[in-house]
From Swiss-Prot:
Residues 1-33 form the signal peptide. Its main location: other. It is found in: Spore wall. The gene is sapA. The lineage of its organism: Bacteria, Bacillati, Actinomycetota, Actinomycetes, Kitasatosporales. Keywords: Signal, Sporulation. One of its GO terms (cellular component) is spore wall. This is Spore-associated protein A. GO terms for biological process: sporulation resulting in formation of a cellular spore.
């Protein structure tokens, strides 16, 4: 887990927006969708998620007792280590955390205090990514991905 200032290569490359990408033509697709694995810990409940092409899912969780959000990016199938990122940022304070590296099954968990604040969150698996800017603004209830989204490859 690493703290990020103003730059995170994967985030900086896409600017402001939600990015969900599709696999290249002819690419193999997994039949199963990645389920949340509970890695954020006790008390964290899934409040939002986005598919990352057909390769996996990035989950946003929230713990109402601590006021923290947690993000984890999970592959649909484990296998050869693949570049992955899990990212979360409190938009109001600017505090952010990310985990990146070559992983077999998941990146993260990463945490940020965000009680009553909107969060920016996302993930990367290989050359596919999904980003959401300004969602789950202080509410425990899940919200659909909101404003500023874009689809394309990393």
């Amino acid at each position: 887990m690493q703290a990020v200032g103003a730059t995170l290569t994967a985030v900086g490359a896409i600017g402001a927006g939600l990015l969900v990408t599709a696999p290249a033509a002819g690419a193999a697709t997994a039949g199963a969708t990645a389920s949340y694995n509970g890695v954020c810990g006790s008390g964290y409940k899934v409040v939002n998620s986005m598919p990352i092409g057909s390769t996996g899912t990035v989950y946003l969780t929230y713990n109402s007792a601590t006021g923290k959000n947690c993000t984890v990016t999970i592959r649909n199938t484990t296998g050869t280590p693949t570049y992955m990122v899990a990212y979360v940022r409190n938009i109001e304070s600017g505090a952010d955390q990310y985990d990146e590296g070559d992983y077999r099954s998941y990146a993260g968990p990463v945490y940020v205090s965000a009680r009553g604040a909107c969060v920016e969150w996302g993930g990367v698996i290989g050359n596919l990514q999904a980003w959401n800017y300004g969602s789950n603004c202080g509410a425990l209830a899940a919200k659909a991905p909101q404003k500023d989204w874009f689809a394309g490859q990393r």
